[in-house]
């Protein structure tokens, strides 16, 4: 009503002014319509508008439609009964089942390959060389470090990746900086990367822990007694030794939930002889990761710690590109056990294998995965060790090798209770452990079975475990990323 009276007064005032100025009636009507239109449009703008006094909400802005990440497929939200619900034939223990639901996420089509993991290795190599190019003890070249912005203001020093490394035609100092990361084999005389120096340092903010009720009163200033927290920190000693340790201390600020980790990222190529001590596997030790012939085979010999570091690097690598355009993306990570199982079973509780039937061979008699169908029968499926990715058909989501080939790390901590400790909504059970914690606490869930396992152990509903600092010739991994809300 108030708006209506206001508009009538505006009409009367406008008419009187136009008449006084001897403007013709037709032109008067046109001008009055424009005035009233402007008044009404102004009244509908902003939070204080008068759209009948209704709650209309604010402008939502632009919703980013996330494109499909390279080499990934979308696993759509779904529900399954997780676990086999059968009695273990060896121990006589019934493995529990649990109905669970999982939201949308992107998942790598294949296991991470040797070629993809080498990109990580070479990035770490190049970052160390660039650090040494800028180090006065080596080349001392300021161009390799950015210390100020475009306006000349100081910034946190960081590497300048736009300056190429002078692999050829370099100075004596530059050559020394490059060679400091290499060594010569004392027996063969071959020049090779010094894998012991390939350390990757990363930080992460434990947002979930910081949000817990036991910490919030102190952080918000409503409590004075500081609760105890565990904080991961890492450093390198003067003699080059990496030290990762967990500190327990009173909470002082939100920064106590920022953790640091330093991980040596080179795969354990000796796993081929240590996993099979009475076997002639030296060829795989020398060639499986190094030889280009295995470039598209799944990387193995990586620990859970290394796989997690790879996910952190992959996130860093992507965000440095897309953040320049103002785009925010979720981080890459290892899948939870629930995510992995739902993806492998095509979100169908009846599926025990990714291909939907209980038969391990197709109608034509061909094996449907790379596994060990009988004692010593590794080559029955035409593959002796991990096969090239995509050697077998994908499941309905478009995921390859979710059974056999290389077993895969998950983010989930292993307990005998299985999924009983987890929520039924996006379930996860994950614990941080210190280097000196007992072995059982270090175990992580491994899914999918491998090239060396029999048919029972490559079922999607089964689970295995391994210590988080052990690299095995049968364990690899793939990454996932939560889909951004609003994407189609």
Predicted regions mapped to residue ranges:
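Positively charged n-region of N-terminal signal peptides that target proteins for export
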Residues: 21-29
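Short, structured beta-strand segments at or near domain termini in extracellular proteins/domains
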Residues: 473-488
């Amino acid at each position: 009503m108030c708006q209506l009276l206001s508009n009538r007064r505006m009409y009367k005032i406008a008419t009187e002014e136009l008449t006084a100025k001897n403007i013709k009636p037709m032109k008067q009507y046109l001008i009055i319509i424009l005035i009233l239109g402007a008044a009404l449009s102004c009244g509908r703008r902003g939070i204080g508008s008068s759209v009948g006094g209704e709650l209309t909400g604010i402008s939502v802005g632009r919703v980013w439609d996330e494109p499909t990440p390279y080499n990934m497929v979308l696993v759509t939200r779904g529900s399954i009964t997780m676990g086999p619900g059968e009695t273990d034939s060896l121990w006589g223990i019934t493995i529990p089942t649990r109905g669970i639901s999982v939201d949308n996420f992107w998942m790598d089509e294949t296991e991470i390959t040797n070629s993809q993991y080498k990109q990580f290795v070479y990035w770490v190599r190049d970052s160390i060389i660039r650090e040494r190019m800028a180090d006065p003890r080596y080349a001392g070249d300021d161009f390799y470090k950015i210390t100020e912005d475009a306006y000349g203001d100081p910034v946190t020093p960081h590497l300048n990746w736009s300056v190429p490394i002078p692999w050829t035609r370099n100075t004596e100092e530059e050559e020394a900086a490059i060679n400091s990361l290499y060594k010569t084999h004392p027996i063969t005389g071959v020049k090779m990367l010094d894998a012991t120096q390939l350390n990757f340092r990363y930080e992460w903010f434990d947002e979930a822990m910081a949000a817990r009720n036991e910490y919030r009163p102190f952080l918000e200033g409503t409590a004075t007694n500081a609760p105890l927290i565990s904080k991961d920190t890492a450093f390198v000693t003067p003699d080059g030794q990496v030290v990762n340790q967990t500190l327990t201390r009173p909470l002082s600020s939100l920064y106590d939930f920022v953790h640091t980790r330093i991980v040596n990222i080179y795969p354990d190529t000796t796993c081929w002889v240590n996993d099979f001590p009475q076997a002639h596997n030296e060829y795989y030790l020398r060639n499986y990761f190094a030889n280009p012939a295995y470039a598209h085979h799944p990387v193995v010999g990586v620990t859970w710690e290394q796989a997690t570091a790879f996910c952190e690097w992959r996130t860093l690598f992507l965000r440095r590109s897309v953040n320049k355009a103002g785009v925010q993306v979720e981080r890459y990570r290892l899948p939870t056990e629930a995510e992995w199982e739902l993806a492998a079973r095509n979100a169908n509780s009846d599926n025990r294998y990714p291909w939907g039937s209980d038969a391990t061979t197709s109608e034509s008699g061909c094996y449907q995965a790379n596994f060990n169908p009988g004692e010593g029968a590794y080559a029955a499926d035409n593959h002796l060790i991990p096969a090239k990715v995509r050697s077998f058909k994908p499941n309905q989501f478009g995921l390859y090798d979710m059974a056999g080939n290389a077993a895969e790390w998950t983010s989930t901590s292993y307990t005998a209770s299985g999924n009983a400790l987890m929520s039924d909504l996006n379930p996860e059970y994950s614990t941080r452990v210190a280097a000196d914690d007992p072995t059982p606490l270090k175990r992580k869930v491994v899914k999918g079975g491998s090239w060396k396992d029999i048919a029972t152990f490559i079922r999607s509903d089964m689970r295995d475990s391994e210590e988080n600092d052990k690299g095995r010739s049968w364990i690899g991994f793939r990454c996932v990323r939560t889909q951004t809300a609003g994407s189609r």
